[in-house]
């Protein structure tokens, strides 16, 4: 995993200092985009289940999974600056109903992220990977939750980043490497943490009405000012999905999401795979002016 960060950091630094044309920008003004508003629902209802049946469809427990997601961006394009503001939220619950027992409810997603990001539009690359822009960036964000989950305290983290980025390409929407400083207010006293982070986002039209989206990030923690059992050594998340247009801005498609984290204070790694089909809506409320 650590090699991923080293490779991404080297690639971004190379792009930033290579001999490319200076960027004058390809867009100007505000752009408001609802990237994704989606709902995933699956349900299994079993009546009179019994271990005497040989079919697993008649021995399983009734269950319902509901998950919603919002991804909104308000971006401003100037001649030498790209200012991005994002709101991301996801929340979901799983309802398990064993025969003859009380319903068990657990959360399968619970995250709210507000972030603002300022990037200097330093270079424009036109003949590599479909073209993109490159430059240094700095960002600050706040990560929390809709409610405290599973008996834990409500997560409250202020996170700042500074590094280099490739962005706004035909296919490569984002590739970055950054130094991270976190202020974690979840527990008292507050903990100041440092990390390296790398990530990317790719979007491409496979054919008319079918779009492929893939994104990922990897965060490698280095120091903590307060030692806690919940401290992470690293975390990584990745998602890939197909958006198949049904009608206007409404789409349906399969997706797979992977999340993995390693504990720093003890030798344990846990991961989560989530696959399914989602119904999603996306649109531009306002598009930036093309130059």
Where are these regions (language model features)?
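Short loop/turn motifs that connect adjacent beta-strands in outer-membrane beta-barrel proteins
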Residues: 24-33, 75-84, 122-135, 167-175, ...
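Predominantly the C-terminal beta-signal and adjacent terminal strand-loop region
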Residues: 231-291
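Surface-exposed strand-loop-strand hairpins of Gram-negative outer-membrane beta-barrel proteins
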Residues: 42-67, 97-104
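Residues on the lipid-exposed face of transmembrane beta-strands in outer-membrane beta-barrel proteins
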Residues: 68-76, 114-120, 142, 160-168, ...
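Transmembrane beta-strands of outer-membrane beta-barrel proteins
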Residues: 32-39, 83-87, 114, 130-140, ...
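Outer-membrane pore/translocation modules
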Residues: 95-199
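Transmembrane beta-strands of outer-membrane beta-barrel pores
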Residues: 36-47, 78, 89-95, 140-146, ...
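Outer-membrane beta-barrel transmembrane domain signature
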Residues: 172-247
């Amino acid at each position: 995993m650590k090699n991923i960060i080293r490779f991404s950091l080297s690639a971004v630094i190379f792009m930033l200092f290579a001999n490319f044309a200076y960027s004058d920008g390809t867009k100007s003004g505000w752009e408001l985009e609802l990237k994704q508003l989606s709902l995933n629902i699956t349900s299994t209802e079993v009546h009179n289940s019994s271990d005497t049946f040989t079919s697993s469809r008649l021995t399983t427990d009734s269950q319902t999974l509901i998950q919603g997601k919002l991804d909104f961006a308000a971006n401003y394009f100037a001649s030498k600056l790209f200012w991005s503001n994002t709101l991301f939220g996801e929340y979901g619950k799983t309802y398990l109903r064993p025969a003859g027992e009380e319903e068990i409810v657990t959360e399968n997603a619970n995250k709210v992220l507000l972030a603002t990001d300022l990037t200097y539009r330093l270079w424009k690359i036109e003949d590599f990977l479909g073209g993109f822009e490159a430059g240094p960036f700095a960002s600050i964000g706040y990560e929390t939750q809709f409610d405290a989950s599973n008996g834990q305290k409500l997560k409250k983290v202020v996170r700042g980043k500074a590094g280099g980025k490739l962005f706004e390409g035909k296919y490569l929407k984002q590739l970055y490497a950054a130094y991270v400083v976190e202020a974690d207010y979840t527990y008292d006293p507050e903990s100041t943490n440092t990390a390296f982070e790398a990530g990317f986002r790719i979007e491409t039209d496979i054919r008319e009405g079918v779009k492929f989206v893939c994104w990922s990030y990897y965060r490698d923690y280095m120091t903590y000012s307060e030692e806690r059992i919940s401290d992470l050594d690293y975390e990584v998340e990745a998602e890939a999905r197909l958006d198949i247009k049904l009608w206007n801005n409404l789409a349906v498609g399969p997706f797979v999401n992977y999340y993995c984290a390693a504990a720093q204070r003890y030798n344990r790694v846990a991961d989560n795979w989530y696959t399914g089909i989602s119904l999603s809506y996306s649109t531009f409320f306002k598009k930036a002016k093309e130059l």
